């Protein structure tokens, strides 16, 4: 039976000196993009050359990242509680989601894009010191929810409103199921994804919350917290 980690594999440090890294996302070329949120930067790591270079400064205090099918980078820009689309060639951003129902979001955190292009993101509240003079540190929405942005980017609606503090989010490669970690309730939930983007058949996946999440080609779900925990 094959293990999760290749035999003889060792954990290696790519680079240090960051304040708080977040949101690893890989493009089609295999480059890994990640954020240093307190320093308001996005970096790119090329595994072939093992070089880490600055991709974008003034990154909206981005947290979670995810690449669209067209190669553009989606970022949960926490500074002004927005969702950004960033051109990978120029680094120029476009605001996709500035608000919801006339109010700021709490702070978009993590992102997953389904195969058909629709986008899910979590919106928990983590009061930030850099919000001083920009917005209140209080809740902006009426709770901490999960949202869906349609593939044509014209419709935005909530798909989960009964969670305490949703954070990590990831779906299966076939686009049938979505996992959402409620880190505030120390649980991870599994949903069925409907054609219109709504979620049904909520079931408890495990008694553990998570920050970032990912899934491999065999369907194993990886949760992060005190280390990395893998569930089959």
Describe the function of each predicted region.
Residues 1-232:
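Sequence-structural signature of mature extracellular/luminal beta-sheet repeat domains
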């Amino acid at each position: 039976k094959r293990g999760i980690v290749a035999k003889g594999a060792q954990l290696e440090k790519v680079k240090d000196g960051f304040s708080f890294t977040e949101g690893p996302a890989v493009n089609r070329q295999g480059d890994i993009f990640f954020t240093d949120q307190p320093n308001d930067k996005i970096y790119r790591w090329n595994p072939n050359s093992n070089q880490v270079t600055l991709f974008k400064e003034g990154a909206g205090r981005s947290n979670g990242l995810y690449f669209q099918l067209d190669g553009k980078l989606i970022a949960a820009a926490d500074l002004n509680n927005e969702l950004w689309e960033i051109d990978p060639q120029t680094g120029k951003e476009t605001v996709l989601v500035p608000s919801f129902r006339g109010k700021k979001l709490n702070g978009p955190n993590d992102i997953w894009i389904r195969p058909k292009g629709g986008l899910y993101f979590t919106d928990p509240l983590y009061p930030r010191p850099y919000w001083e003079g920009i917005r209140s540190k209080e809740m902006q929405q009426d709770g901490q929810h999960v949202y869906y942005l349609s593939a044509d980017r014209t419709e935005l609606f909530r798909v989960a409103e009964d969670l305490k503090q949703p954070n990590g989010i990831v779906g299966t490669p076939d686009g049938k199921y979505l996992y959402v970690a409620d880190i505030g309730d120390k649980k991870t939930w599994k949903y069925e994804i409907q054609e219109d983007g709504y979620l049904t058949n909520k079931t408890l996946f495990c008694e553990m919350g998570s920050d970032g999440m990912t899934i491999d080609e065999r369907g194993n779900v990886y949760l992060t917290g005190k280390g990395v925990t893998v569930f089959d």
